[in-house]
Swiss-Prot record:
<feature type="signal peptide">
    <location>
        <begin position="1"/>
        <end position="15"/>
    </location>
</feature>
<protein>
    <recommendedName>
        <fullName>U-scoloptoxin(11)-Sm7a</fullName>
    </recommendedName>
</protein>
<dbReference type="GO" id="GO:0005576">
    <property type="term" value="C:extracellular region"/>
</dbReference>
<dbReference type="GO" id="GO:0090729">
    <property type="term" value="F:toxin activity"/>
</dbReference>
<keyword id="KW-0964">Secreted</keyword>
<keyword id="KW-1015">Disulfide bond</keyword>
<comment type="similarity">
    <text>Belongs to the scoloptoxin-11 family.</text>
</comment>
<keyword id="KW-0800">Toxin</keyword>
<keyword id="KW-0732">Signal</keyword>
Length: 219
């Protein structure tokens, strides 16, 4: 999973064309590079340093950057540790205190951003991640904008509320990265139906070298 940004947020957010992608529909190879238990990136300040998701298959943990100084990024499922911000079904973990008092995101608000930067002066790989508002509970994570320059990659996400699925829509994609599962929800099932979580119930399966993706439809 390859989430998130910030060079100057306002410059970045207005300097490239809108692109609609879910967080796992793009850059899967790059996400897979960051899906191990280690990361080569250093957090610039009190950025979010990891993502956790407790889904139907497992507890998915994605370290993003190493906290500065003696701080360690908390990788345990503890929403009350003071270092967790819940964004939909994903727990953002912070190097120190999580932000409080954020407004709730609207459907078109940029919710969080990320930047991966190669600092040529220090020869270090740096990550900067900022959160601007709090996502509601039932949302999808949607890649709004992306920018790539030499040594820099930036992304911006919004988190619109889930709409009701049509009969042909995928309600969730379940990604299997070597028995490390991550889920992306797209819509909620109509009354009387549910989104399956058994992998053998997948409506479609897409196999690649680095992962298997299971597409579920409401039943």
């Amino acid at each position: 999973m390859y989430l998130f940004l910030m060079i100057n947020y306002f410059v970045l957010a207005n300097s490239f064309d809108f692109q609609g992608y879910s967080m796992n529909a793009r850059n899967e190879k790059s996400k897979q590079k960051r899906s191990s238990s280690e990361t080569d990136y250093v957090c610039i300040s009190n950025d979010y340093c990891a993502f956790l998701q407790k889904n139907t298959q497992n507890l998915y943990t994605l370290p993003i950057c190493k906290c500065p100084g003696d701080n360690e990024c908390p990788l345990t499922w503890d929403p009350d540790d003071g270092r967790t911000l819940i964004q939909g079904d994903i727990h953002f973990k912070f190097c120190s205190s999580a932000p409080v008092g954020l407004k709730q995101c609207g459907s078109d608000d940029i919710a969080y951003t990320a930047m991966w930067n190669k600092n040529l002066k220090t020869n270090t790989s740096e990550f900067t991640g900022e959160v601007f508002c709090e996502c509601p509970k039932e949302v999808t994570h949607f890649l709004m904008k992306t920018k790539n320059e030499e040594g820099i990659e930036g992304q911006a996400y919004k988190c619109p509320k889930l709409q009701t699925c049509t009969s042909e829509e995928i309600c969730v994609h379940i990604y299997n990265y070597t028995n490390n599962f991550f889920e992306i929800k797209y819509c909620k099932c109509p009354d009387g139906q549910s989104c399956p979580d058994e992998l053998n119930s997948a409506a479609e399966t897409d196999v690649k070298k680095e992962r298997i993706r299971y597409g579920m439809k409401c039943k």
